[in-house]
């Protein structure tokens, strides 16, 4: 996955370390949680319901799902059911503490030991039977519809997590999500962040299984509550200060909405249109993360805070270069080890000095052409100061270009791409190529490339958050169809204009989803807004059609 994501990153001409990390986390989360490739030997006559599968429609790649849904009137009162707790039902407190308890098996060492033993047993059985990697519990269960789950095995697995539900109930009701990290003291913020954040995905997987098991046993109200808890965890992580966290939040939110779509197929499931309408919009709020992201370079390399426009002596820059060589060498080693880039060399004072001499003309041109610094002012700086000042200024420039994708409404970006956003991106691309020297890996060729090597690919982060909202709105549209069908004799509407409640909007177009109905089957199509390059298709069947299918 890392290698494939690196290729994606390079194809996008984004060569940053964080770009790769974001693509690895987000793409693996979406694929794992939502999309299944049909097996070559699968029975094509057997339809899967409530599960995303990869497919095509008129040559276009799609994420497709078939749903069988029952008409269901709106709840009375309208907010009888909640997915995200109401403000008056929330408690001031830190949800992160509760998630850590649930993930860390706090005072549950025996259960943790038994779980490890059980997983080893299932893994060994799969090896003995020469099954493919991951083709054993609990991983194989994510492909199974609730009614087909092996109840005894699932119950055995979930019993070892039986301490979690009460903790997760409390977590969903907390107002804040904060890890209170002393990030400014960390020499490697990336390595510091990833382990704890990634563990939330496993917690969401267990919750998803817990939800489907509740559906299988007819515990619908409990399943509704679990779906809300998964979504709340995604929303919580989305408020964290790091984009890595927000992307994991996107993945968790997707797991929750997928479980919700599965739940919508049950005849006893209450209508959740208004519960979804009351959920946060946007589902994943990127404001805090983008604010912190804009100073990530200085967090990763605090020494660069000493670089500014104040004229400094040559002696200062000799000492600064010595100290910076150690910092850069540590960062380069982390980059090389993380992505198996064995050809990347380390840095020492001599190599930095050689690079400064080579990069000085490009650095001076950048400060003159982009920032408008006068020749007289530039003449007062040493070559070393000009190069390091360019790193800071280029990072500022690159961050602002990336930030544009966040402040422009997602549905209007198509028009914007032909004007201001594209011009700025083209300018940044030009300087990026000039600084990186003939397409070499940036960290190995020029210290100037540090200006954008730690800039997140914000257009893809914004798209991921929009895709999360899109999925939630798709589910809400399904609930609108169920609600309206309950009012008009169980019939599907011919147009979303006929819905008795407002049609949710597709974030990719800021319009209702595309909709077709032949009276028996309706199809919802969402715009293509994520990097998988796939549309999302949902087919809906009326109550009468389901009765015929079950006979």
Language-model segments: which ranges?
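Compositionally biased, intrinsically disordered or flexible polar/acidic segments
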Residues: 2, 31-32
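Bacterial N-terminal signal peptides
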Residues: 19-28
């Amino acid at each position: 996955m890392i290698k494939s994501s690196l290729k994606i990153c390079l194809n996008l001409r984004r060569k940053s370390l964080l770009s790769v990390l974001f693509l690895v986390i987000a793409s693996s989360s979406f694929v794992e949680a939502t999309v299944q490739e049909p097996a070559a030997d699968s029975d094509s006559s057997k339809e899967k319901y409530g599960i995303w599968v990869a497919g095509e429609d008129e040559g276009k790649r799609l994420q497709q799902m078939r749903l069988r849904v029952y008409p269901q009137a709106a709840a009375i009162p309208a907010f009888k059911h909640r997915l995200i707790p109401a403000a008056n039902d929330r408690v001031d407190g830190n949800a992160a503490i509760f998630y850590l308890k649930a993930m860390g098996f706090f005072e549950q060492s025996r259960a943790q030991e038994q779980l490890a033993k059980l997983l080893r047993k299932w893994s060994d059985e799969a090896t003995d039977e020469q099954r493919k990697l991951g083709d054993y519990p609990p991983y194989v269960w994510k492909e199974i519809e609730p009614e087909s789950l092996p109840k005894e095995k699932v119950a055995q697995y979930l019993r070892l997590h039986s301490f979690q539900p009460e903790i997760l109930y409390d977590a969903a009701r907390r107002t804040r999500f904060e890890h209170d990290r002393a990030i400014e003291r960390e020499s490697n913020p990336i390595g510091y962040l990833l382990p704890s954040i990634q563990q939330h995905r496993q917690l969401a997987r267990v919750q998803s299984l817990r939800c489907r098991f509740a559906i299988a046993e007819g515990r619908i109200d409990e399943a509704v509550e679990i779906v809300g808890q998964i979504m709340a965890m995604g929303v919580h992580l989305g408020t964290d200060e790091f984009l890595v966290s927000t992307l994991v939040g996107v993945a968790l939110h997707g797991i929750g909405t997928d479980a919700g779509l599965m739940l919508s197929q049950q005849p006893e499931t209450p209508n959740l249109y208004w519960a979804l309408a009351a959920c946060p919009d946007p589902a994943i709020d990127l404001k805090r993360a983008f604010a912190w992201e804009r100073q990530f370079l200085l967090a990763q390399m605090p020494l660069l805070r000493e670089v500014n426009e104040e004229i400094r002596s040559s002696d200062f820059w000799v000492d600064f270069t010595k100290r910076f060589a150690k910092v850069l060498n540590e960062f380069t080693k982390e980059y090389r080890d993380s992505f198996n880039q064995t050809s990347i060399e380390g840095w020492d004072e001599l190599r930095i000095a050689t690079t400064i001499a080579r990069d000085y003309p490009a650095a001076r041109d950048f400060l003159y052409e982009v920032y408008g610094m006068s020749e007289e002012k530039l003449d007062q700086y040493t070559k070393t100061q000009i190069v390091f000042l360019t790193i800071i200024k280029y990072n500022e420039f690159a961050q602002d270009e990336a930030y544009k994708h966040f402040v422009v409404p997602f549905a209007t970006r198509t028009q914007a791409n032909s004007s201001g956003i594209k011009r700025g991106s083209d300018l940044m691309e030009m300087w990026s190529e000039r600084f990186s020297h003939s397409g070499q890996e940036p960290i190995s060729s020029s210290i100037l490339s540090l200006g954008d090597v730690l800039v997140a690919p914000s257009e893809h982060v914004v798209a991921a958050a929009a895709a999360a909202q899109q999925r939630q709105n798709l589910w809400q549209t399904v609930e609108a169809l169920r609600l309206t069908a309950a009012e008009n004799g169980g019939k599907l509407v011919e147009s979303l204009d006929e819905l008795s409640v407002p049609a949710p909007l597709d974030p990719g177009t800021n319009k209702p989803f595309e909709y077709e109905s032949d009276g028996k089957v309706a199809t919802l199509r969402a715009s293509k807004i994520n990097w998988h390059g796939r549309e999302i298709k949902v087919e809906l069947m009326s109550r009468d059609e389901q009765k015929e299918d079950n006979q």
